[in-house]
Amino acid sequence: MMDALRVLLETSTFNEVLRGLAISILLAKLTQSTTSSSKSQGSTFITASGFILIYFFARSWLALVNHYAPEPYLDEVFHIPQAQTYCEGRYHEWDNKITTPPGLYLLSVGWHKLVRLVECTPSSLRSNNLVATLLIALIALSCRRRIEAQTAVGIEKSAVSFYAYHTAINIALFPVIFFFSGLYYTDVASTLVMLVAYWNHLNRVASHSEKPGFLNGLWTVVLGVAALFMRQTNVFWVVVYMGGLEAAHVVKGLKPKPVSKNDTPDFVLENIRDSFGFWLRRYAVGDVHDPPVDMAWPDDWALCLLSIGIAALCNPLRVLRQVWPHITIMGLFAGFVAWNGGVVLGDKSNHIATIHLPQMLYIWPFFAFFSAPLLIPRVLSTLADLITHARTPTPSHTTTKDPGRSSWRFTKPSITSKKSSTTKPPQRSGPTPASSSSSSSSFSPDTNSSGRGFRFILDLVLSRKLYYPFYLLATILLSAAIIHYNTIIHPFTLADNRHYMFYIFRYTILRSSLVRLALVAAYTLSRWLIWKRLEGNNPPLRDLAGETGLKITKNKLGWRDEFSASPFVTQDFYGPKTIKTDEQKNIKDKQKEVEEEEEEEEKEDWLIGGAYTTLSLSSTQPSPATSSPPTSTVLLWLLTTTLSLVTAPLVEPRYFILPWVFYRLLVPAMPVSSSLVSSSSSSSFASSTTESGNGDGNDAATAARQQQNGNGKRGLLWNIIRRTDAALALETVWFLAINIGTMYMFLFKPFYWKTASGEMLDGGRLQRFMW
């Protein structure tokens, strides 16, 4: 260890420190919002601190690797000589053992010419990935900023939230990415190019009114081809994921004329054909069903895919005008496959495409392990909800049971949740609910309808989500069947004990078939936790709206009525209100008061520092960072992940990098009141709003205002600290700990391959542990 410290001190020259600081400050300046004020110098320094952490941590890792493993190691044995061949201008020479395209080597040649490096040495080639890691943080920040801008309003659209910044830093520190920042592998550069392509895609869908031009389409093709030059499997992310998102963007921007409730046929047995025909026509004109993922159940997933698919098929020219670059990329890739005789370059015998469905089971524990700090708030929130609902009796003033909310309402609300009879929901492009004075509870039996039994069953199955336990059981049985019939153990997994996956398989999957089946529980729980984390958590506002029928308009949460286009939601879902008028008015007054206070606070925050104080983490006014992604986006992510993984017989953590990166970019922020920091303010507000109308909640609002005013006087640093999600900070610490552990194993725990008789193998070279 003393030798390692000496190496770090020797490489940390004054010029090196200045270079690192200059690069970090430059990157921080590039992230600054155009709305930042003259006081943004402090925020620039704090922004730079994240890049400083990445630079010096990665620089130290690179220096140690160059010292302890100066010669090419493992796959570097193929990559470094090939890059050196390109550096010498011999572009027609190719090592047939290399299976990936030459994108990494071309980037290296360009980088060496840019910085005027004469020779392509192992250390100089490895340094390419250090630069790429810094750029990953920068581009990831831009991508997350664009994602948040999709639900932002006003000044927030041009802002950079602290959550976006912290997320970008953590993505760059992701252990499987960061480890290869010190080695010459394709993964870091491939991730960077994919993020650039994704950033371009987000710019293309930034507006429904402004269509991307032809030159931008050509640029999209160039970026897509560049991504394919890094890895062949990137075609799924460029074509399926980004192309699918752009197709969905087009059909959601059609904006059909709204229809009245009187023109909407009721979904009853004798009218089922007319109802289906009506909704097929509505989907055809773009009235699609795409709720936020935290409001969607499996039936919503099916309706989402169906409605968007119908809309795309019925509007082919509009869709083609948007997605032609992705179709072009797919055509070019198909031409390459035909010319090459397959997807893989070089050694095709050990990389044969095989249907390997267990990959979609292995990925969930992988995600859960690395996302453990982010899952803690969700677990605690679920446990708290379970305890609360178990202890809290039904309010005495509630005269009608809410049939629109499922029995699993503590998990998430349903889009079939009851609305108030006196508060009209905002009009959307689909049917609008009529006054509930003409209806009772959800799908209540109608004595004038012969289909009341059908509606009652529909109520049980869809409104109360009676099918959900059967859905869970089906996923468990399907997982068990996949394990039993499709488990594949690639020879490389068992032949190389230098990879961590060797030991994971050895002590779990290879133990016995019983252990394999027992792991279904881990796969199921991990999948549920990851999905719930994608949903985010905004319980105070949503529970408040669901219980009282408060009007939810186009707020920062993005929860609005306009996404609902389901034939199963009728006027009967909007039952009589179950709360006193005075009590509802009291809640509205308190909500309005807190919102006004938060607006004033946000104005002050903007003036303090544009890049850091844009994220409002209050319980009643969630910022765009807390908005859950649309269901279509998550389903496309899941589809693309499946396509990119199930064709690979070999299980490698590196294959999970892009699925994890895109998942992490979609994860919404957790309100501070829902994080590990404190939930006192949220609890006080939630409890005050559920009082029986006596106005006791005003004390909580006053206390919160006094606390906020006091905190605002402590300056930028305190503002950042109190707005920082502790789970996000814990994720940073978690990644640093994992990185230090894997660095230690690679550098200081080498071993030799020996036969049973003690004879050295592999020429007596040191072997090292790695991902």
Swiss-Prot record:
GO cellular component, one term: endoplasmic reticulum membrane
GO terms, biological process: dolichol-linked oligosaccharide biosynthetic process; protein N-linked glycosylation
GO terms for MF: dolichyl pyrophosphate Glc2Man9GlcNAc2 alpha-1,2-glucosyltransferase activity
Glycosylation site residues: N448
Protein name (database record): Dol-P-Glc:Glc(2)Man(9)GlcNAc(2)-PP-Dol alpha-1,2-glucosyltransferase
Biological source species: Neurospora crassa (strain ATCC 24698 / 74-OR23-1A / CBS 708.71 / DSM 1257 / FGSC 987)
UniProt region (Disordered), positions on chain: 392-449, 584-605, 682-708
Enzyme class: transferase
Biological pathway: Protein modification; protein glycosylation
Gene for this chain: alg-10
